[in-house]
């Protein structure tokens, strides 16, 4: 009878051993797939921007004020494109001189086939149409098309001292 138990244990070990090996292989593949790689960094620049403000009777310092921006842009690979943005004021703190604004920015290249989009809210000085120079805002990347289809990650938008802008995208692999 002891011999039969021993064979049963060996049989059980033979069944679990391939199963265990298969689980190890699947686990290794899963870990490799999830480990990803290094984030891809893409940088766009453009000159100073002047908004078109849409709120009758104000300079834009009101909830619901809409500012639109357009500028020629350049990618770090030398390609030329455009920068388009819409900014909506969603809250005003008059005592602090600050506004919360929701912004969507689209960088478009290759006649619009390649677009990278970021969107998010930030606090701005009420007196200006943009963040102060030498300041940076971080926003999520919400998508893209063409070359950047399925893009996700985050972007830093920096208002440079000379009035120009640098937008650094950190795209997940």
Each language-model region and where it sits:
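Targeting-peptide/extracellular-domain and disordered-appendage signature
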Residues: 5, 34-173
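Residues at the start of alpha-helices and the adjacent loop-to-helix junctions
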Residues: 13, 19-20, 138
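Bacterial N-terminal signal peptides
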Residues: 18-32
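N-terminal secretory signal peptides that target proteins for export/translocation
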Residues: 1-15
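Serine/proline-rich low-complexity intrinsically disordered segments, especially terminal tails, linkers
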Residues: 8, 18-19, 37
